[in-house]
Amino acid sequence: MSDTATRVQKIVVEHLGVESDKVTQE
């Protein structure tokens, strides 16, 4: 996963309060 996607994932996790493994785009 690209660095940008990682940053987006982190933001989504912080805003939605979901687990990171549910947001992975692999």
From Swiss-Prot:
4'-phosphopantetheine is transferred from CoA to a specific serine of apo-ACP by AcpS. This modification is essential for activity because fatty acids are bound in thioester linkage to the sulfhydryl of the prosthetic group. It comes from Erythrobacter longus. GO terms for biological process: fatty acid biosynthetic process. Keywords: Cytoplasm, Fatty acid biosynthesis, Fatty acid metabolism, Lipid biosynthesis, Lipid metabolism, Phosphopantetheine. Carrier of the growing fatty acid chain in fatty acid biosynthesis. The keyword Lipid biosynthesis applies. GO terms for cellular component: cytoplasm. The gene is acpP. InterPro entries: PP-bd_ACP. Pathway: Lipid metabolism; fatty acid biosynthesis. Residues 2-26 form the Carrier domain. It is found in: Cytoplasm. This is Acyl carrier protein. Belongs to the acyl carrier protein (ACP) family.
